[in-house]
């Protein structure tokens, strides 16, 4: 989340991924004012004729929120309410409108801030990592931001393999891979290169001569392409090279819960009902949730539950379904937690 404080009641934010959109959903409430860019049909009324269907134009509005909802399938946050201000004189104040917020959309929020709400927006997402899984046959490039994994591209080298002795120039393939990785890197991102054989080192050396972050070369990943990317995100090599990241922390919590379960300890919870009871007792130390929580509890109940758990001092982490971590939490009821004590 790109975050900037405007004044004591207003902030400007740009969500970067679905984790950020859900953080906004947890913060924005009825009565808050949200300003952003949107489209609206402007109808021309003519005497003795029906109004036409109107031309859809882009305007800036300030909306007093009445309802908020997530549309996970389309990756957007919908904010419905009444227009308080508009950049168009043809849009009447007080008329109803829905503002759709996608990743990359800039909005400003004006409200009476509750405890921890600003921190929730500032801390959403975490550092970004560009992951490159390469060998002599293919190169997979992805960007991991928080726990959201976005596959960027997969390049094929055109190598005939070991069975056929032909002259193959790997230089052009590596040049294309370095260029594609450079396009994926955003400000503040780290760059991690891995894969079988020595190709990863050749690519990392080539990247060092470009305006890119210093690439970290990781060993122990035996696959390239998309398979290599997904193998890396659930490996010990990921935790070593990304220690302190949100993804590494989520994987540590999942493994801690599984270890506690194997020892038949009472200091963990799985599923919405069990974890909600632990939250009501103030027992939660760290909590990981996935999209499955919304399916199990309902959207508003999930938001209230997470906000209440955070108010007791629990560490809250989302696990996106684009990664193995999110799928594992889905399979465990949509939410898991380590506990300070048995409730």
UniProtKB/Swiss-Prot annotation:
UniProt KW keywords: Cytoplasm, Endonuclease, Hydrolase, Metal-binding, Nuclease
E.C. number: 3.1.-.-
Top-rank EC class of the record's enzyme: hydrolase
InterPro entries from the UniProt entry: eFR1_2_sf (IPR042226), eRF1_1_Pelota (IPR005140), eRF1_3 (IPR005142), Pelota/DOM34_N (IPR038069), Pelota_arc (IPR023521), Ribosomal_eL30-like_sf (IPR029064), Transl-rel_pelota (IPR004405)
A GO cellular component entry from the record: cytoplasm
Compartments where found: Cytoplasm
Listed SUPFAM superfamilies: Dom34/Pelota N-terminal domain-like, L30e-like, Translational machinery components
MF GO annotations: endonuclease activity; metal ion binding
A GO biological process held by the record: nuclear-transcribed mRNA catabolic process, no-go decay
Cofactor(s) needed for function: a divalent metal cation
Function as written in the Swiss-Prot or TrEMBL entry: May function in recognizing stalled ribosomes, interact with stem-loop structures in stalled mRNA molecules, and effect endonucleolytic cleavage of the mRNA. May play a role in the release non-functional ribosomes and degradation of damaged mRNAs. Has endoribonuclease activity.
Domain free text: The N-terminal domain has the RNA-binding Sm fold. It harbors the endoribonuclease activity.
Assembly with partners or alone: Monomer.
Similarity field: Belongs to the eukaryotic release factor 1 family. Pelota subfamily.
Protein's UniProt name: Protein pelota homolog
Lineage: Archaea, Nitrososphaerota, Candidatus Cenarchaeales, Candidatus Cenarchaeaceae, Candidatus Cenarchaeum
